[in-house]
Amino acid sequence: MSYNNHSFGFLLIFFIISVSSSVKSQTIDIATIADAANGLKMRSIGPAVMGGRIADIAVSEQDPSNWYVAVGSGGLWKTSNNGISWKPVFDSQTSYSIGSVAIDPNNSQVVWVGTGENVSGRHVGWGDGVYKSNDGGISWNRTGLFKSQHIGKILIDPRNSDVVFVAAEGPLWSAGGDRGLYKTIDGGKTWNLVLEIDENTGVTDIEFDPSNPDIVYAAAYQRRRHVWALLSGGPKSGIYKSSDNGETWSKKSTGLPKGEMGKIGLAVTSANSDIVYATIEAENSEKGFYKSINKGESWEHQNEYISGGTGPHYYQEIEVSPSNPDLIYQMDVFIRVSRDGGKNFKVLGTGREKHSDNHALWIDPENGKHLLAGSDGGLYETFDEGSTWRHFPNLPIAQFYKLDLDNSEPYYNIVGGAQDLGSLIGPSRTMNTEGVRNSDWYVPLGADGYDNAFDPEDPNTVYMEIQEGNLVRYDRLTEEGMDIQPQPGLGEMAERWNWDSPLLISPHNNKRLYYGSQRLWRSDDQGNSWKSLSPDLTTNRNRYELEMM
């Protein structure tokens, strides 16, 4: 595994300078610090056992053993042997968050990457444009759209590899940026904005007509995220069509929702190029799955199903079988499948055979039962259309929110709270010559892991957290977990917890804990009892009355 040691050194220098700048009498020898930092090397201690959030999957048409996996906040990984081993190929670039990856169908050495995840959560990573590799990921060139922040999809014209479309969602937390549908006709040297809606609306998905790439479909998405809420949708969201390779566009409306729309996923199939599918976030009975049988000119509402979980903004990807136009897969908490052209959907398998929260799916064009699925828990493969799955436990891409270290000797341990992977505990080193292995890590608490802490005097006592302020004290010797979340008194209003609530152990008394909801709590007995130290410290405003856009 490779790491960017120069970037790490720069960050270390910046940190030291920042901390020391208040001490005006102190002189800093930058050259000495830089020399010391360059000698530091990062090493991987995992874990890979749980995977991490996959944003996109690309498989070479010319050599199906070559796969690229785009990770929400873990770069781009490549395998040349069907997943037996992996190599990170994007570590030296300036963005760690990937939203889309595409392989040139005419030359598998040419790979395009769109940085910045294509979801709208508070935890989303953003990017710095579009990258291109001409040597299978060995080297990269940043080609443009530096202010796009989030790329939904990249499409390469199969007739001319210099023609590439990029769906740029634009910044999530603000207006403007590089937003809309962009096109290059010179392999990324220059870019033209061919579909511009407004400063708040980007493009989240695009598809070619499989029989005629001059026909392009695009899904526009109006959105805005604030700390207190997400506005997913608006009057400018919708489905657009071009019949001249992106030169002119028309917004389609016949049969589509009359009200405002949110995130839209599109899909086409070479089995019948007249059919276009769309899953549309909308209000009430207008939401759901839509089908066109005349290349997007008019649409019919099939049902009201849309992706659920934390909201359609987190999913909405759909894929259609290349050989059966009625066979559709929709990404959701559990993958859903329709075998009747979108009229009915059901969970693929039981949904429990693999990790939940799915974002990407590849269908083998030679064997429709062979699928690759990317989820919050990493990459999975099935050869029986989801009846059984195998996980790839060799991708160390978990997204850690917080971590803490204990005071064990000779090697300290780490506890980390990870997105959708729970809380994990593992050693910093082992006596094994192979280093830290998957088997050295374990998961004492599931769900999403957040703030955590070892008791500084007793490394067998660990505090771990689940979303919404659920706090657990865990005994590593007995493997007993106890819920110690503070509770309001009789007659008091319910506590309002952050998704990631703050926890602190007093440096003066290891029995004393501080924990935060809308007020500050203190425990002097390791969480067995709690006392509120403050009133409501928030403004207690109704978030629905705050301006969103």
Residue ranges and their predicted role:
Residues 26-549:
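Beta-propeller blade termini and top-face loops
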Residues 1-28:
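Bacterial Sec-dependent N-terminal signal peptides
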